[in-house]
UniProtKB/Swiss-Prot annotation:
The keyword ATP-binding applies. It comes from Salmonella arizonae (strain ATCC BAA-731 / CDC346-86 / RSK2980). It catalyses: L-cysteine + L-glutamate + ATP = gamma-L-glutamyl-L-cysteine + ADP + phosphate + H(+). This is Glutamate--cysteine ligase. The keyword Nucleotide-binding applies. Its EC number is 6.3.2.2. The lineage of its organism: Bacteria, Pseudomonadati, Pseudomonadota, Gammaproteobacteria, Enterobacterales.
């Protein structure tokens, strides 16, 4: 089932320096909650500056949903320590609030009024909040409070020069983009390994079912928690953050122009369902528009091709201008065993897996084949630890035992690990392979099995409160290592100034501005 990568691995072993200079970045979302686990109803803390313009700390869907962003970094330890500093500083500024340590929220009642993230009075800020109003009216606010970690990854130019002989210019743009699309196609085929190892949402609170009937064979605990005994990541299931209405968009990952055309089609195609919502009610705007996607970022995907945008540029126009610059992996649950929601083992594994995905052959995939890959993901998401579980290849009927496929994959990853360790010294990458490959023979070692044991004992709420309290105490006590308090204060003040400048520069009423930007 695993493609034959022996030639590509032999090439890599002859060109180890091609992997010198991998760049990464992390984003982590987390809800601000009160001591009893309920959602904080306070505004974004003043000490954290402007959520619109702060470089490192912003908000996602809700005013209480923090998002931490590291700068691009070539050093794993430095990146994780930077992320930890963001958490340390924030923990000191949250008063009695703490950060929820799980992907799935708990103490949010069905229909509870969740305040949308606020970004001030500028047209840009109001647009961001209106987009979130549209998300709420389309999918419900509860789904949008699910948190995750995003891992951004790019290969050095030296890799593309050695592998594809690229120099600068348009030909390089096309070849590099084609390489990243190969990575994405392999991710769709084999990325289920991420929720298998690191999924940490095997259970949900009853409010998530919102009274809707479900065919899933949930078991229920006395405290009202629903769980599937072999599930890994219900966050990635249809109960979590996915979007069924997008599954027939026909967006593919074979070619840059084809991909962008599919994206642009989706933001221009009206949706019968969203037309029903309407654009306004009682003078209040309900969504940016009634198209399948309000804006490109609404496309739900487990992985995205990205390029840093220029001012006023859409993500797809940035891709057309310069090609794919980096990849955003979006399938990581919050790691509940880390105070910052992610750890070094995960980052090193993702490095290895991304390199493998770019080396392995990946035939082009039609949109129907892409849908077939979803079957393996769903199987792993809902029953990944089930004894005897098998996986298929694309739309074919042949089935293979998951543990065998996992161990075959790790045989390749270990060779990538040896190459990366030869560049950096030590055996850190190989050690990660040894630790994680054991999860295929013993699923009890996976994140989902470990966290489920705690959740069955104390419920999602009890687990979340206990871990959140422990991390709050730990982070508040730890000294800052990279950033200093003065730098946080300077960025707070600068971000507020930047927001004020944007607001002062606006001359157009929002309705007129929106008409031009929709």
């Amino acid at each position: 089932m695993i493609p034959d990568v022996s030639q590509a691995l032999a090439w890599l072993e002859k060109h180890p320096q091609a992997l010198k200079g991998i760049q990464r970045g992390l984003e982590r979302e987390t809800l601000r909650v009160n001591a009893d686990g309920t959602l904080a109803t306070t505004g974004h803390p003043e000490a954290l500056g402007s959520a619109l313009t702060h470089k490192w700390i912003t908000t996602d869907f809700a005013e209480a949903l923090l998002e931490f962003i590291t700068p691009v970094d070539g050093d794993i330890q430095h990146m994780l320590t930077f992320m930890r500093d963001l958490h340390r500083y924030t923990a000191r500024k949250l008063g009695d609030e703490r950060m929820w340590p799980l992907s799935m929220p708990c103490y949010i009642a069905e229909g509870q009024d969740i305040e949308l993230a606020q970004y001030g009075t500028s047209n840009t800020g109001r647009f961001k909040t209106l987009y979130r109003e549209g998300l709420k009216n389309r999918y419900g606010a509860l789904m949008q409070t699910i948190s995750g970690v995003h891992y951004n990854f790019s290969l050095p130019m030296a890799f593309w020069q050695a592998k594809c002989g690229v120099t600068e210019g348009d030909a390089a743009k096309e070849k590099i983009s084609a390489g990243y699309f190969r990575l994405i196609r392999n991710y769709y085929r084999f990325g289920w390994v991420i929720p298998y190892l690191f999924g940490a949402s095997p259970a949900i609170c009853s409010s998530f079912l919102q009274g809707k009937p479900t065919t899933l064979p949930f078991e229920k605990t006395d405290c009202g928690m629903y769980y599937l005994p072999y599930a890994t990541s219900l966050r990635l299931s249809d109960l979590g953050y996915t979007n069924k209405s997008q599954s027939n968009l026909g967006i593919t990952f074979n070619d840059l122009h084809e991909y962008v055309a599919g994206l642009k089609r989706a933001i221009k195609t009206p949706s019968e369902e969203y037309v029903q919502i309407g654009l306004e009610k009682d003078g209040k705007r309900l969504q940016i528009n009634s198209n399948v996607l309000q804006i490109e970022n609404e496309l739900y995907a487990p992985i995205r091709p990205k390029r840093v945008t220029r001012s006023g540029e859409s993500p797809s126009d940035a891709l057309l201008r310069g090609g794919i610059e980096y990849i955003e992996v979006r399938s990581l649950d919050i790691n509940p065993f880390s105070p910052i929601g992610v750890d070094e083992q995960q980052v090193r594994f993702l490095d290895l897996f991304m390199v493998w995905c770019v080396l392995a052959d990946a035939p082009e995939m039609s949109s129907s084949e892409l849908l077939c890959t979803r079957a393996n993901w769903n199987r792993v998401i809902l029953e990944g630890r089930k004894p005897g579980l098998t996986l298929g290849i694309g739309c074919e009927t042949a089935q293979f035992p998951l543990p065998k496929v996992g161990k075959d994959l790790f045989r390749d990853l270990r060779r990538v690990a040896q190459t990366l360790d030869s560049i950096h010294g030590g055996e850190d990458y190989q050690k990660v392979c040894d630790e994680l490959v054991a999860c295929f023979d013993n699923p009890e070692l996976t994140f989902s099995a470990r966290i489920l044991r705690s959740m069955i004992d104390t419920g999602i709420g009890g687990t979340g409160k206990a871990f959140g309290e422990a991390y709050r105490n730990l982070l508040r006590e730890e000294p800052l290592e990279i950033l200093q308090e003065e730098e946080f204060i300077a960025e707070r003040d600068a971000s507020v100034r930047r927001q004020q400048e944007i607001e002062a520069a606006d001359t157009e009423p929002f309705a007129a501005w929106l008409a031009k930007h929709d």
